Amino acid sequence: MARYGATSTNPAKSASARGSYLRVSFKNTRETAQAINGWELTKAQKYLEQVLDHQRAIPFRRFNSSIGRTAQGKEFGVTKARWPAKSVKFVQGLLQNAAANAEAKGLDATKLYVSHIQVNQAPKQRRRTYRAHGRINKYESSPSHIELVVTEKEEAVAKAAEKKVVRLTSRQRGRIAAQKRIAA
């Protein structure tokens, strides 16, 4: 069994999925993953579907140099955003796989959320391109390893109402005692 970057606190209430050596851009996939981290599973799947339809965009926060601006980034408080279709499709596939794994474990699909998602760089695939004057340059791709864990949300237990402890000074205690004596 492969090791994951994060260990779940309750393995019985979580399901995982991973993809290794995927030929998809590391930078785009990292931004896609961070966009849905911590989201409910159904909400994340719907969002990624909207990204493919160009109705919403993926905010680019780290790898955002030379990226154009779009108004769709305002939703996340950024100006730079894109619609990385290939990355979205790979992440969608892993979300679907994790949902199937959760269903096999008997978890409630409506309570699942993305508790951990991580994208790592895989070894680069090297090719070459031929340039003018007999030169050769490298032509590399940046594949990714993606891992994600979906966890069932625990129902919040209502906190018991605290009794407010009133601290009285000796003068206040004396006054209350005097009032009780008068009333009795």
Swiss-Prot record:
GO terms for cellular component: cytoplasm; cytosol; cytosolic large ribosomal subunit; preribosome, large subunit precursor. It comes from the Eukaryota. The modification Phosphothreonine is found at T70. Gene3D superfamilies: Ribosomal protein L22/L17. The keyword Cytoplasm applies. There is a cross-link at K46 (Glycyl lysine isopeptide (Lys-Gly) (interchain with G-Cter in ubiquitin)). Its main location: cytoplasm. The keyword Ubl conjugation applies. GO terms for molecular function: structural constituent of ribosome. SUPFAM superfamilies: Ribosomal protein L22 (SSF54843). Transmembrane segments: none annotated. One of its GO terms (biological process) is cleavage in ITS2 between 5.8S rRNA and LSU-rRNA of tricistronic rRNA transcript (SSU-rRNA, 5.8S rRNA, LSU-rRNA). Keywords: Cytoplasm, Isopeptide bond, Phosphoprotein, Ribonucleoprotein, Ribosomal protein, Ubl conjugation. It is found in: Cytoplasm. Component of the ribosome, a large ribonucleoprotein complex responsible for the synthesis of proteins in the cell. The small ribosomal subunit (SSU) binds messenger RNAs (mRNAs) and translates the encoded message by selecting cognate aminoacyl-transfer RNA (tRNA) molecules. The large subunit (LSU) contains the ribosomal catalytic site termed the peptidyl transferase center (PTC), which catalyzes the formation of peptide bonds, thereby polymerizing the amino acids delivered by tRNAs into a polypeptide chain. Belongs to the universal ribosomal protein uL22 family. There are 2 genes for uL22 in yeast. This is Large ribosomal subunit protein uL22A. It comes from Saccharomyces cerevisiae (strain ATCC 204508 / S288c) (Baker's yeast).
